[in-house]
């Protein structure tokens, strides 16, 4: 099963398992994973499965979503992406 490891300054890493359900990320409490960084939008991104692969989608966040230092709108993830 795929896992997402979320690192936030001053906090221990959060490990999220990616199964068949979408996982919503953002500052708002109604997200599956609530993040604390001020640069994170209330509803920032979602991650889920598409055809057996892991897909990360930005939810029109103000500061953007980045994979390997490149801003993305939507991207299929690979092992070791950051």
Where do the PLM segments sit?
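Forkhead-associated
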Residues: 2-8, 12-82
């Amino acid at each position: 099963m795929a896992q997402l490891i979320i690192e936030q300054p001053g906090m221990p890493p959060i490990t999220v398992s990616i199964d068949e359900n979408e996982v919503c990320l953002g500052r708002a409490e109604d997200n599956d994973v609530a993040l604390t960084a001020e640069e994170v939008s209330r509803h920032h991104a979602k991650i889920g499965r598409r055809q057996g692969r892991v897909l990360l989608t930005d939810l029109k966040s103000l500061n953007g979503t980045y994979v390997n230092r490149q801003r993305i709108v939507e991207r299929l993830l690979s092992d070791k992406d950051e």
